[in-house]
Amino acid sequence: MERQEESLSARPALETEGLRFLHTTVGSLLATYGWYIVFSCILLYVVFQKLSARLRALRQRQLDRAAAAVEPDVVVKRQEALAAARLKMQEELNAQVEKHKEKLKQLEEEKRRQKIEMWDSMQEGKSYKGNAKKPQEEDSPGPSTSSVLKRKSDRKPLRGGGYNPLSGEGGGACSWRPGRRGPSSGGUG
């Protein structure tokens, strides 16, 4: 039993000496060359990233070349599909342009018609703004709103014809009077 105890106590002493030796050598190496080791690791990482990206691109090019060489029919079909899609998009765009041109033409025709109506109403001596509402009323099918509203000539005026707000006549509790002349204190000097 004593032998087993001696061998167990001897083993940890050897292991601890080995760990101490390893610790001192690694510690001294890091203390001496630590920054060099850190920078070299960073440099190796960057170089590895660059090379791996280039290798991936090179492999992809080789695969694309192999696929194109093996299946030229697929490439031709892709190009035809792409051309058909472009043609379809161009046709849709042309249709939209035609619709827009037609809409602009209709708006221009409407403006021209309104200008002609304004000119005619001005020649007759009527207000052109009142006529701008007539085309909208004509377009709406339904009961005429003009029959519901009284005409301007049929209405009773709100005030008498001789009403002048600056004269002070015409009724009401408030009337305008000109201010007095002269200083407000009542005397000169």
UniProtKB/Swiss-Prot annotation:
GO MF: antioxidant activity; ATPase binding; enzyme binding; signaling receptor activity; ubiquitin-specific protease binding
Biased composition (Gly residues): 159-173
GO cellular component, one term: very-low-density lipoprotein particle
InterPro entries (alphabetical): Selenoprotein_S
UniProt modified residues of type Phosphoserine: 140
Signal peptide range in chain numbering: none
Compartments it resides in: Endoplasmic reticulum membrane; Cytoplasm
Record's keyword annotation contains Ubl conjugation: yes
Domain of life: Eukaryota
Protein role: Involved in the degradation process of misfolded endoplasmic reticulum (ER) luminal proteins. Participates in the transfer of misfolded proteins from the ER to the cytosol, where they are destroyed by the proteasome in a ubiquitin-dependent manner. Probably acts by serving as a linker between DERL1, which mediates the retrotranslocation of misfolded proteins into the cytosol, and the ATPase complex VCP, which mediates the translocation and ubiquitination.
Known partners and oligomeric status: Interacts with DERL1 and (via VIM motif) with VCP, suggesting that it forms a membrane complex with DERL1 that serves as a receptor for VCP. Also interacts with DERL2, DERL3 and SELENOK. The SELENOK-SELENOS complex interacts with VCP. Interacts with CCDC47.
Protein name, as recorded: Selenoprotein S
Organism lineage string: Eukaryota, Metazoa, Chordata, Craniata, Vertebrata
